């Protein structure tokens, strides 16, 4: 499989691939997985005054999954939680030039973010 330059960049040096400090005020977490697709994603968000003050992620999966989680975490930081809740992973697919057949894996990225926003 050939990967876009953006996927290669995010996979080689993912942005915000980190665990946020335990006990931080406003810290929420959410995760999603699909063992049949070999994918697991976990986001942590620190929410201060309805805004994402910090975002971090952990991911297991193919380069597309890791790159998408990197883009989403980077995009979310600094945005209002209401805006983050409206993320459409298809936009991330287009930005990273990810083939539509990988959408099932990327939906787990969206599911993890939604779970985080519900916390």
Locate the predicted segments by residue.
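Domain-level signature for proteins that mediate thiol-based redox and metal-cofactor handling
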Residues: 1-119
């Amino acid at each position: 499989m050939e990967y876009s330059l953006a996927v290669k960049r995010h996979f080689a040096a993912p942005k915000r691939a980190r665990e946020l400090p335990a006990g931080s005020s406003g810290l929420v977490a959410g995760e999603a997985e699909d063992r049949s697709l070999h994918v697991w994603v976990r986001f942590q968000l620190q929410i201060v005054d309805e805004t994402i003050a910090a975002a971090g992620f952990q991911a297991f999966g193919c380069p597309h999954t890791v790159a998408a989680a990197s883009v989403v975490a980077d995009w979310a930081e600094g945005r209002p939680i209401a805006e983050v809740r409206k993320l459409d992973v298809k936009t991330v697919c287009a930005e990273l030039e990810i083939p539509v057949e990988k959408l099932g894996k990327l939906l787990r990225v969206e599911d993890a973010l939604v779970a985080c926003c519900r916390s």
